[in-house]
Amino acid sequence: MSKSVQLIKDHDVKWIDLRFTDTKGTQHHVTMPARDALEDDFFEVGKMFDGSSIAGWKGIEASDMILLPDDDTAVLDPFTEDATLILVCDIIEPSTMQGYDRDPRAIAHRAEEYLKTTGIGDTVFAGPEPEFFIFDEVKFKSDISGSMFKIYSEQGSWMSDQDIEGGNKGHRPGVKGGYFPVPPFDHDHEIRTAMCNALEEMGQTVEVHHHEVATAGQNEIGVKFNTLVKKADEVQTLKYVVHNVADAYGRTATFMPKPLYGDNGSGMHVHMSIAKDGKNTFAGEGYAGLSETALYFIGGIIKHGKALNGFTNPATNSYKRLVPGFEAPVMLAYSARNRSASIRIPYVNSPRGRRIEARFPDPAANPYLAFAALLMAGLDGIQNKIHPGDAADKNLYDLPPEEAKEIPQVCGSLKEALEELDKGRAFLTKGGVFSDDFIDAYIALKSEEEIKVRTFVHPLEYELYYSC
């Protein structure tokens, strides 16, 4: 009996919710009666849908596509009144019954399979740490009459002199003052706990939760690592849980990289390692306990860092986070335990846990694409023995200009990142993991956003130039 059928029978499930992720990382769903999943061929034939309605996918002349549910992903939805079973789906091309070339989950699957063909390893593990803000209310608009946004947060540092219903209690983190405070300074302990309870209920293993550095409600929930595709699935589930619990509490959550000017943004540090025959290939006798394989993996990420930014930092807003002075790693260098480097080697108690941590990605990234791209960059480093050079065991934020200019940096804008992705794509197309067709479509899709933001009249321009 399949996992789905067992859950349907055990919990009297009424509905199944088929979910998939588009190119930008947005989740979509369609809901159908649970009885359909009891049919013998459901997991072979799937459900038809209109692919032309998904940005960056099909044209209207060839729009039919298939949602093929993955039985291993079956989990009960804790937020629905009627018992509902969530199933993550792969996108299938009806003409070939193969995975759709532009499906991000299919790309992540191909990256895992490509790893096996290289002989370097058979399993890749990913452990992302997506940060997020929880606000009380947000208002924004952008049209021909003007543009604005306004954040309402009782715990914002700017609220100390404001009238608040029930009284202003005064306990709130200041700018860059929110790391690890206890309640009542940590206003979000209970809501994070509710999020963690929901994640555990959905099969994820929570390791830690805490308030993060920024004021106004920056938070993090740490969940146990997993294999690449499964971890990307779990990131999407975590986002779903965070948004829905916040909504249930009458609040609103965001994973945008830099919602506040003048305070830390939200990153998504990604821990990675490769195993072969059950052994961690990153453990060795070199720098910080790393193997030569791990150092070459780091070398690949550093070499392709700017091209990677197109997937790991895919928003114009990403580059408002990637600036010096806000704990964002802009230098493409590596170091043990040095959080100013873009690649860190965390301290571990056992060689089994040896890994690298890429610190420049952010949670606007599509996790399937970001994890797959990081893996492909690392594999290229291993295959071509790209050594990363000496470790940067110093505070890179304080380097004098003449030293800083010798260290490569991440991109400074989405436009630059897309240009670097375009010209540096060769490492991604190995083994057919990313296709040129997909990369072209992705660049076109993200370029539309970049052009819109770049050409839109900004409120700050009125402040700077209205009286010229």
Curated annotation (Swiss-Prot):
GO cellular component, one term: cytoplasm
Pfam families reported in the protein's UniProt record: Gln-synt_C (PF00120), Gln-synt_N (PF03951)
Protein residues bound to Mg(2+) 2: 131, 212, 220
Annotated PROSITE patterns: GLNA_1, GLNA_ADENYLATION, GLNA_ATP, GS_BETA_GRASP, GS_CATALYTIC
Cofactor: Mg(2+); Mn(2+)
Residues binding L-glutamate, per UniProt: 264-265, 321, 327, 339, 359
Regulation: When cellular nitrogen levels are high, the C-terminal adenylyl transferase (AT) of GlnE inhibits GlnA by covalent transfer of an adenylyl group from ATP to Tyr-397. Conversely, when nitrogen levels are low, the N-terminal adenylyl removase (AR) of GlnE activates GlnA by removing the adenylyl group by phosphorolysis. The fully adenylated enzyme complex is inactive.
GO molecular function list: ATP binding; glutamine synthetase activity; metal ion binding
Residues annotated for Mg(2+) 1 binding in this entry: 129, 269, 357
Coiled coil (residue ranges): none
Cofactor note: Binds 2 Mg(2+) or Mn(2+) ions per subunit, however the activity with Mg(2+) is about 10-fold higher than with Mn(2+).
Entry's family note: Belongs to the glutamine synthetase family.
Oligomer status and interactors: Oligomer of 12 subunits arranged in the form of two hexagons.
Purpose of the protein: Catalyzes the formation of glutamine from glutamate and ammonia. In vitro, can also use hydroxylamine, methylamine and ethylamine, with 32%, 7% and 1% activity compared to ammonia, respectively.
Name used for this protein in its record: Glutamine synthetase
Species per Swiss-Prot/TrEMBL record: Pseudomonas taetrolens
